Amino acid sequence: IYNTNLIIDNQGKVIGKHRKLVPTWAEKLTWTSGDGSSLKVYDTAVGPIGTLACGENTNTLARFTLLAQGELIHIANYISLPVAPPDYNMAEAIKIRAAAHSFEGKLFTIVSCSTISEEIKDALREDVPNVDELLTRKNSAFSGFIGPTGAVIGEPLIDEEGIVYAEIDLEKCIQPKQMHDILGHYNRFDIFDLRVNIAPTRKITFVDNHEDFNKR
């Protein structure tokens, strides 16, 4: 509802959430922006997990913020985009972004992407007779695993609904970091300085005689 990813642990407990920082394109008709308070990495039984939603996986600063907190497993979720320009390969674009983050951070990325099912098209058909023409196209969705070398692990799903399985070994993040660790020896923090505002944004504050109601 709020353009938000939930982090759920292996006990079924919600341990965190991340609201998309900037709604993309038509999303602006429904949602507003998130804030830096949810740019967090969570310790889980399988390793440190961070997440970003859809197009914000292109945001280099947001991605680095997660990497700097020790992220080793990145969750990236996307929507299928059948309304993209005809020459735009959405599946490839998703894979490129996931591979870039995995290669830069020397970590694993798990990608999940929605698909346009026949049920969705059937639900729209009465009001949108040309729904097949509008929503049927190849290479609109990619779901799969990307390793720390930027290579795909296992068999991804392209334009299909299903579950992708792959085995990941966090020790495989070590050797690549020995070559290029942008969080340590392979960076210059005497030159670069990233500041991140993690304060929750308050959309509105009610006051009466200059007294903050929220402090009562």
Tell me the role of every PLM-derived stretch.
Residues 3-7, 40, 143-145, 164-166:
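Short beta-strand scaffold segments in enzyme catalytic cores
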Residues 5, 16-18:
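Beta-strand scaffold of nucleotide-dependent catalytic cores
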Residues 7-13, 100:
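Basic phosphate/pyrophosphate-binding loop/patch that engages nucleotide-derived ligands
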Residues 10-11, 45, 148:
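Short, ordered coil/turn segments that flank beta-strands lining enzyme active or ligand-binding pockets
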Residues 20-34, 160-179:
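A short, polar/charged loop-to-alpha-helix boundary motif
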Residues 38-72, 173-216:
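Cysteine/selenocysteine-centered motifs that mediate thiol-based redox chemistry or coordinate metal-sulfur cofactors
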Residues 48, 54-164:
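CN hydrolase (nitrilase-like) catalytic-core segments centered on the catalytic cysteine
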